[in-house]
Amino acid sequence: MITMKMFLFLNEACIFIDSVCEGIVFWGLCLFVCAECENASYRGAEVPYKTLFRSCDTSIFGVAECLNLVAIDPRSEAYC
């Protein structure tokens, strides 16, 4: 079980720009969800692609693709 961690979930309102899976991936609006208390908050984000991993099959723009789940850098981690 993951405790006291903040994760960034790609929201349907997010702007997703992926340059051949390299460099920086940008989100215009992102949703942070605390795994411990399930509180959520929105903010813009800019996260290096190397922190990404594919979690589940979904469709964001009408094309089958994977939802991106981004682990937040410990230096910017937030606690409840």
UniProtKB/Swiss-Prot annotation:
The keyword Transferase does not apply. GO terms for cellular component: membrane. It is found in: Membrane. Its main location: membrane. The chain crosses the membrane at residues 13-33. Keywords: Membrane, Transmembrane, Transmembrane helix. Disulfide bonds: none annotated. It is a single-pass membrane protein. Belongs to the UPF0377 family. This is Putative UPF0377 protein YMR324C. It comes from Saccharomyces cerevisiae (strain ATCC 204508 / S288c) (Baker's yeast).
